[in-house]
Amino acid sequence: SGQVETRLAQMPLVMHPSPRTALFLGYGTGYTANAAALDPRVSVKAVDLLPEVIDAAGIFALKQGAPASASPVATVAADARRYVQSTTDRHDVIVADLFHPARNGAGSLYTLEHFAAVRSRLEPGGLFCQWLALHQMDIETLRSIVAAFVQVYPNAVAVLASNSLDTPVVGLISRPDQPAWQVETVRSRMTEVSPRMAKALKGAKL
């Protein structure tokens, strides 16, 4: 149904008061990035290590019934960690995908150094979201990731994208320049989105 993929895209977007640019670290099937691009006011870019994944994403998105984006998603074939370190671009929202910590090289995407590099690529008032698939890690790995995250983002909050017993997904989210989260601000933001995004939010039960 794409409900979780839609949440992975839009929960970070609605927690920012006025996003104009969003960077997705990890492209996969393209569903999540396309869901973010439902709002024509948001320019979306996605980075994925494998160009073959980017090429095949359109096929997977079509079979999954992914929503047609309001504007094209810009894609970059690159290592996410190195891309963040080398780019000079800044973004209002940066979203990191569900990287399996046991896969070769993925561990470097959960380090204090990487989280700090991401923070340096946020626009003033920007937001970073790191999604975590809890079923893919043990408790010690989770504790290590959370400890590194809160060192860089002390005001972080955790949100559930999926409370499935089989595939639970939690997000670590922070706006470093924002001292505290205002629930009223998030609720107000959800009433101001584009009609297509509002429909997707309803479909994702947000």
Feature annotation, model-predicted:
Residues S1-L23, L62, A78-T88, Q136, ...:
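Soluble small-group transferase modules, centered on the S-adenosyl donor enzyme superfamily
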Residues Y110-P124, V150:
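A short glycine-rich, Lys/Arg-flanked "PGG" loop and its adjoining helix->strand segment in the class I
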Residues D89-D97:
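Short SAM/SAH-binding signature in class I
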Residues P101-Y110:
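Glycine/threonine-rich flexible loop motifs
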Residues G125-L132:
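Conserved beta-strand signature within the Rossmann-like core of class I S-adenosyl-L-methionine
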Residues H100-P101, A133-M137:
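Short "lid" loop at the C-terminus of a central beta-strand within the Rossmann-like core
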